[in-house]
Amino acid sequence: MTERPMRRKDRQFSAADARAILAKGTHGVLSVVGDGGWPYAVPMNYTVMGTQIYLHCARAGYKLDAIARDDRVCFTVVTQAQVIPAHITTLYESVVVLGRAQVVTAEEERLAALGSLIDTLGDVTPEIKAQYLAKKAKNTTL
């Protein structure tokens, strides 16, 4: 993967700042190489555990088909966007991550990531979280 340097160095975050932005976000846009090489982007909830970003979806679908063909992805998170009308601009707090996607097959890791994802979406009681995991985990891909 060839990484181009940012044009606006004054707006580039450190790796630690980028991780902090990822940690406070709840959704982003996953971009994959779709049919015929066309880009396909879809908004998704996510969670971060360690150095990994986990996304969840159904067991089958277009994005999983695309990832099976070409695992190169881009994930973009925007946590703030402030329009500055006087300067005809917008100030963003965002992170763009390039990487390779893979389906999580280890059940323990899958359940931990799904539990973490539930936690990022708000205050959920342990009982509701357990009910959700029992009911939906088997139909969820991470």
Language model: regions and residue ranges:
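Charged, gly/pro-rich active-site loop segments
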Residues: M1-K9, V83-L142
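Short acidic (Asp/Glu) patches
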Residues: H56-G61, T76-I84, P126-Q131
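Helix-adjacent hinge/juxtasegments
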Residues: D65-A68, C74-Y92
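Short beta-strand segments
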Residues: G25-R59, F75-T76
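Extreme N-terminal tail/first-helix region
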Residues: M1-A23
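Short Pro/Gly-enriched beta-strand edge/turn motifs at strand-loop
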Residues: Q12-F13, K24-V29, P126-E127
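Anion-coordinating catalytic cores for phosphoryl-, nucleotidyl-, and glycosidic chemistry
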Residues: D10, R19, Y62-D65, F75-V77
